[in-house]
């Protein structure tokens, strides 16, 4: 996922007094020479350059290689489920994040200044923000789809186009909400002599409301929707599991049990829900520190110290980590469960109805296309 950069405002002497952040470029935190208690440190682009480049290269390799493996895995499957579709969309978004956000940030670290024309500056910033929104909205779409799969399973089976509609809406909103970036950002020579792709505000007071709106559109509103969706899903699963245990314990008619079992939530769906929740938790862990830091910083609630600058370097890199972690989560959940072939037939003859049902669900679960 894309991360951000931070813009400093200056006093009459050109000394940076404020560090404002904006989630518009992957793992970017820009600050300028700041003086605190007689100590001076320089621009973010020239500070910790080696360490930042090593971190960015590692993130880039893991993001591109990991998501390429995921895309190849989903492409070669004969049976494409709706969950596979969403996994593919998430991998595509993360891959573009690596190419558009992390790679351009690596180039930027090498050059220090922004060397490309103003048009390139605006286009790059626009694409970075599009991916920022898309990464979040794809997760919202996934949560809505899982909600329908568990709470309204019959409508879910009849609505195959819903997944594609959700993704189209997610990307459309991402492109729409990112349009202001084309106007706000441009190539600019800063007071310290650096040439950067920067926000062209009439006044620094515009920065706080802009970042507040972005924070709500990118993080807080989507996170609220996701939390509500999965809260209902977990509650539904818990209720159905309790009902299932009660019915099965009192069930003696095989046909009746079989009929009832068809209305239950399969372990394949349960595993898909677990995968989705872990993906969401990774998103929260990677993005929460950034947005909390960003809000506190924009409302001047953080002290102007060197420690804050060091903290920003670490925190602003966390969102990019999300795109590298997602493929690892997929690999963990897509591991297959094998059964000894020679023992299957003999075991089938002595299995109870419940054991056969559970084993059938495990066989479904072991197939990657059902994840």
Swiss-Prot record:
Sequence ranges on the Cytoplasmic membrane side: 74-82, 145-164, 234-275, 334-371
SUPFAM superfamilies linked to this entry: Family A G protein-coupled receptor-like (SSF81321)
Gene name as annotated: NPSR1
Topological type in the membrane: Multi-pass membrane protein
GO biological process: neuropeptide signaling pathway; positive regulation of release of sequestered calcium ion into cytosol
Species lineage: Eukaryota, Metazoa, Chordata, Craniata, Vertebrata
Annotated glycosylation sites: 4, 13
Protein name, UniProt field: Neuropeptide S receptor
Alphabetic keyword roster: Cell membrane, Disulfide bond, G-protein coupled receptor, Glycoprotein, Membrane, Neuropeptide, Receptor, Transducer, Transmembrane, Transmembrane helix
CDD domains in the record: 7tmA_NPSR
Membrane spanning stretches: 53-73, 83-103, 124-144, 165-185, 213-233, 276-296, 313-333
Function description: G-protein coupled receptor for neuropeptide S (NPS). Promotes mobilization of intracellular Ca(2+) stores. Inhibits cell growth in response to NPS binding. Involved in pathogenesis of asthma and other IgE-mediated diseases.
Subcellular location: Cell membrane
Membrane topology, Extracellular segments: 1-52, 104-123, 186-212, 297-312
Organism: Macaca mulatta (Rhesus macaque)
Family membership: Belongs to the G-protein coupled receptor 1 family. Vasopressin/oxytocin receptor subfamily.
InterPro entries recorded: GPCR_Rhodpsn, GPCR_Rhodpsn_7TM, NPS_rcpt, Vasoprsn_rcpt
Pfam family, one: 7tm_1
GO molecular function list: neuropeptide receptor activity; vasopressin receptor activity
One Gene Ontology cellular component annotation held by this UniProt entry: plasma membrane
Chief place of localization: membrane
Disulfide bonds: 121-197
């Amino acid at each position: 996922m894309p991360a951000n950069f931070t813009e400093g405002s200056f006093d009459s002497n050109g000394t940076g007094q404020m560090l404002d952040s904006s989630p518009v470029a992957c793992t970017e935190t820009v600050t300028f020479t700041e003086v605190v208690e007689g100590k001076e440190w320089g621009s973010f682009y020239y500070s910790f350059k080696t360490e930042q480049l090593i971190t960015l290269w590692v993130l880039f390799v893991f993001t591109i290689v990991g998501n390429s493996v995921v895309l190849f895995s989903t492409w070669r499957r004969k049976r494409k489920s709706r969950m596979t579709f969403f996994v593919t969309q998430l991998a595509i978004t993360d891959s573009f994040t690596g190419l558009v956000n992390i790679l351009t940030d690596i180039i930027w670290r090498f050059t220090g200044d922004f060397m490309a024309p103003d048009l390139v500056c605006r286009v790059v910033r626009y694409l970075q923000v599009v991916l920022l929104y898309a990464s979040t909205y794809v997760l919202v779409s996934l949560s809505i789809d899982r909600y329908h799969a568990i709470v309204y399973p019959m409508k879910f089976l009849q609505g195959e186009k819903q997944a594609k509609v959700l993704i189209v809406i997610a990307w459309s909103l991402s492109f729409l909400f990112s349009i202001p970036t084309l106007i706000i950002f441009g190539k600019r020579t800063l007071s310290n002599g650096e040439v950067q792709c920067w926000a062209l505000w009439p006044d620094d007071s515009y920065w706080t409301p802009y970042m507040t709106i972005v924070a709500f559109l990118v993080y807080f509103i989507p996170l609220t929707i996701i939390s509500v969706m999965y809260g209902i899903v977990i509650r539904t699963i818990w209720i159905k599991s309790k009902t299932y245990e009660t019915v099965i314990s009192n069930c003696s008619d095989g046909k009746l049990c079989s009929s009832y079992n068809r209305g239950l939530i399969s372990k394949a769906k349960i595993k898909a829900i677990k995968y989705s929740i872990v993906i969401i938790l990774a998103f929260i862990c990677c993005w929460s520190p950034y947005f909390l830091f960003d809000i506190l910083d924009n409302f001047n609630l953080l002290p102007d110290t060197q420690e804050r600058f060091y903290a920003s370097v670490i925190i602003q890199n966390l969102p990019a980590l999300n795109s590298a972690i997602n493929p690892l989560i997929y690999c963990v959940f897509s591991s297959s469960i094998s059964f000894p072939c020679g023992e299957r037939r003999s075991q089938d003859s002595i299995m109870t109805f419940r054991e056969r049902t559970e084993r059938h669900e495990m066989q479904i679960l072991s197939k990657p296309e059902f994840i």
